[in-house]
């Protein structure tokens, strides 16, 4: 589900670049040095279960992105999203309510991955890795805790698995 787009600094792919520690934020960069990238959520339907990976942009981001993201994240991401792009509206068009989501899996808590989280808090389970939840407690310019405050996120314990793509896996069901 494409929930809109964002402008990303070309430094995102190389945060250790000579451009400085925070060059990836895109602040004070011209649009010429930024890339227009899609913001997506992935719906997986398997064995009668509805699983959503990430949430993309929300309805609130379409209505008032500066307020929703805060000034720094707004300027660093410059979201483009309409109400119909939001994950909640797209799921609704497919006949899926938040309560019909068996799981929402958050890969990480950057704003473009969790903006739509509050629209989906009726999901049966919302997961993120234990490590990501621990990192979210630290100061991080890429995170806006208001996007997940009041939403219960369950920690996933990742286990060593030599067959898994990154050497770890977890069984949710």
Label every model-predicted segment.
Residues 1-96, 100, 129-173:
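Metallo-beta-lactamase
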Residues 61, 114-115, 136:
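Glycine/Thr-rich phosphate-binding loops of Rossmann-like dinucleotide-binding domains
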Residues 56-58, 110, 132:
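Catalytic metal-binding/acid-base residues of hydrolase active sites
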Residues 1, 51, 105, 127, ...:
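Hydrophobic/aromatic beta-strand patches that form the interior of the parallel beta-sheet core
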Residues 66-128:
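Active-site metal-binding motif and surrounding structural segment of the metallo-beta-lactamase
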Residues 44, 53-54, 101, 108, ...:
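Divalent metal-coordination and catalytic microenvironments
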Residues 39-41, 48-50, 104-106, 123, ...:
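Extracellular structured ligand-interaction cores
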């Amino acid at each position: 589900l494409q929930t809109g787009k964002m402008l990303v600094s070309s430094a995102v792919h190389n945060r250790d670049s000579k451009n400085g520690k925070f060059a990836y934020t895109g602040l004070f960069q011209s649009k010429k040095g930024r890339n227009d990238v899609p913001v997506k959520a992935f719906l997986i339907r398997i064995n009668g279960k509805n699983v959503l990976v990430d949430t993309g942009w929300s309805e609130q981001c379409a209505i008032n992105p500066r307020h929703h993201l805060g000034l720094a994240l707004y300027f660093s991401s410059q979201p483009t999203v309409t109400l119909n792009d939001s994950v909640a509206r797209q799921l609704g068009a497919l006949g899926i309510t938040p309560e019909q989501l068996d799981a929402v899996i958050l890969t990480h808590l950057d704003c473009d991955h969790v903006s739509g989280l509050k629209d989906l808090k009726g999901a049966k389970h919302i997961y993120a890795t234990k490590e990501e939840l621990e990192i979210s407690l630290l100061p991080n310019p890429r995170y806006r805790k208001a996007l997940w405050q009041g939403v219960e996120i369950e920690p996933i314990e990742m286990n060593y698995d030599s067959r898994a793509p990154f050497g770890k896996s977890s069984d949710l069901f």
